[in-house]
Amino acid sequence: MMPRAQLTTFLIVTSFLSTVPYLRAPVHGGVLTSYDVSSLDIMSKIHTDHDATTKASSDFGHIVHATPNGVFRPTFPADIAALIRLSLSQPTPFTVAPRGKGHSSRGQAFAPGGIVVDMSALGDHGHHTSHRIDVSVDRMYVDAGGEQLWIDVLHTALKHGLTPRVWTDYLRITVGGTLSNAGIGGQAFRHGPQISNVHELDVVTGMGEMITCSPEVNSALFFAVLGGLGQFGVITRARIRLEPAPKRVKWVRIAYSDVHPFTTDQELLISKWASGSGFDYVEGQVQLNRTLTQGRRSSSFFSATDLARLTGLAIDTGSVAIYYIEGAMYYDDNTAASVDQKLDALLEELSFVRGFVFVRDASYVEFLDRVGREEQNLRSAGAWDVPHPWLNLFVPRSRILHFDAAVFKGILRNANPVGLILMYPMNKDMWDDRMTAMTPDEDVFYAVGLLRSAVAGGSGGDVEQLERENAAVLELCDLAGGGIGCRQYLPHHASRDGWRRHFGAKWGRVADLKARYDPRAILSPGQGIFPPPPPPSPPPPAAGEPITAS
């Protein structure tokens, strides 16, 4: 039998050579132009070797694995269009999944038996690499390739004194990846998620068409793709809004022993989005008692002395958890003289435990790239490439205290997780409901992230235990059972019915958009939303032709 790699290449080559290598180029205002791509050039970019397929069979989660038949390394977006059109030329199309840095946790970027597109190869011409990030200072935007890392977008924009407005906590992930989900962070209460800060996209659809879209042109595709989980197209370029960049940050954490003032103060802070009196960034963390008394003795923010004081607070108050609001106040040379006074005035409005306010002064880049430094520490300790059974939820404000009581004081009461638990509110009116991303039906909702790791020999429990706890949390949240009514962020559902409940009233629209832009369901199969259609039935035998068993 021919080895799998050789067989795959042979079948693809022979089938591809039978197609016409004629592609559609980007659609601008409905005008089509032609673009020829050599079939042999496309074939040379499909890698079926063990190293390539093995890397593409795992992700940051290290929980599920699925091997593709090949990895495609495109030089241009038109190469991706050619690959998709090749798939569509087959009686049974192969699936295609774009992969950035592989930071998904449940195989969302997998293509079992199909082709994974290594987006990082875009712009790589062998002898040189095109830097696919261009800043318009006059019009205050940056054009960034879908494969570009946010950390590189940051550094490029800062050369012009500009910055995007909203950041995920971790910056070494791709533009296309976060925009396919939403892209949330501590600035989202003020500016919405990253998808609310996009002016224009270049997209390769599941039909192999290269289309430029915006809220005004090809708007159905634009709104479908943003938060669309890769179901309608591959983002190859995004035009992202910029603003003047600050130079430094007052980085603050304030502690609470009770969830009620913690949530009240967070909601007060995000209500100040239209004024200049509040924080520019608001997030929050939940630290379970056992992680203080039995966890590490220092962190990238807290000193050993700080953690000892926080441990004492937990013991003295008998709290199951200590809650932190994390805030950031940006400033530059013009506001440096007044920032401390502004911060003090804001803190006076809040009801944290007096004496438990911690302030650091950091550069803007140091603050934004804080998780990058933590990554280096975890890699050095061998604690980065481990299973990450993460669970991210959006919880309605009306149910957040119930969630806290049932989860942090119930399901996880005796847990000692390795990792973080995030909890912070956002304003729903900063989201655009025309986009595919889903949020609860309340004006304010909380992002809750159980960002836990299964570290070998650690005290956080094994993967199975963490998964059981996640399942209990999801059961609590399940809408079908009359639960809290959460929505998953970076969602994973094991059934079609689960996806129907996830999208709710949007399900019909999502299904219609799928039929329009990816009718053969070849894109991003790892999400498990739309199964590919079955292969066509063979034609009946001609009259007099013997019927043979297959």
From Swiss-Prot:
Positions bearing carbohydrate: N289
Annotated catalysed reactions: N(6)-dimethylallyladenine + A + H2O = 3-methyl-2-butenal + adenine + AH2
Domain of life the protein comes from: Eukaryota
GO cellular component terms listed in the entry, alphabetical order: extracellular region
Task performed by this protein: Catalyzes the oxidation of cytokinins, a family of N(6)-substituted adenine derivatives that are plant hormones, where the substituent is an isopentenyl group.
Family: Belongs to the oxygen-dependent FAD-linked oxidoreductase family.
UniProt xrefs under PANTHER family: CYTOKININ DEHYDROGENASE 10 (PTHR13878:SF65), GULONOLACTONE OXIDASE (PTHR13878)
Name of protein: Cytokinin dehydrogenase 10
Taxonomy of the source species: Eukaryota, Viridiplantae, Streptophyta, Embryophyta, Tracheophyta
